[in-house]
């Protein structure tokens, strides 16, 4: 059974006194073999840090101590310094847990634009996704939790080992993102998936009504995932950029970070408003 509540503990969020340009929310499902990678990525985020125009917010569920924490990442801060709230164990595969994190972020750190990053393992949509992925890379890819026995509509992201391997399947993700749209009164500006196999047209089609731009990889990601220091330093320096511009920068930063070590990777940004055009073209082509 999925958990639907959060036991609050620790400190309280410091409500932002003004509206920022961006709130960058990272939902980190680290209750699995990515726990250490989560801490490294938080350290990368702290190299940039939040500013008056950019809030960097994280919710991390860890496997090591079975706690969930919320952070506002500051420059030079990180896991030990920036924790705002601490809860008991949560199930990252429960849509309500994701929704609660976003609502907390929106209520306390309002902004002109919002980016939501889903951080974990992903299993995309297509049955043959694993066979199409890149071969062994220099660093271990995030592949150990792929679930290819599920029906396509049930392929997932944000797996939680201590909640029976529960995850957000594509239908749950569609519903919770629709709820977030209602909360915002508009589409989410940018949805990022720092996970394997998630940036497929089939996934984007299900999410098209809730997000403006989608960023992710259609094949496996290495364990190191996104280069958050580079991504967020640019956002902090240019906080007035729109979602499409920011998405292009994420893609360029990701590809450049692996080019130097010679790894085969993919990352792309999709204009979700054009997904219906792709769908119509596919239908006409195959009729």
Residue ranges of model-derived segments:
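A residue-identity detector for tryptophan
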Residues: 22, 104, 119, 125-126, ...
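Short, low-complexity, polar/charged sequence segments that are solvent-exposed and flexible
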Residues: 43-47, 76-78, 135-138, 210-213, ...
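N-terminal extension/subdomain marker
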Residues: 1-112
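Surface-exposed loop and adjacent secondary-structure segments within mature catalytic domains
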Residues: 58-90, 113, 117-167
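Terminal, contiguous helix-loop blocks that mediate binding/assembly
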Residues: 2-17, 140-287
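Extracytoplasmic/secreted cell-surface and envelope-processing proteins
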Residues: 34-38, 65-68, 124-128, 198-203, ...
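Structural recognition of the beta-strand scaffold that forms the well-ordered cores
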Residues: 23-27, 55-60, 114-118, 189-193, ...
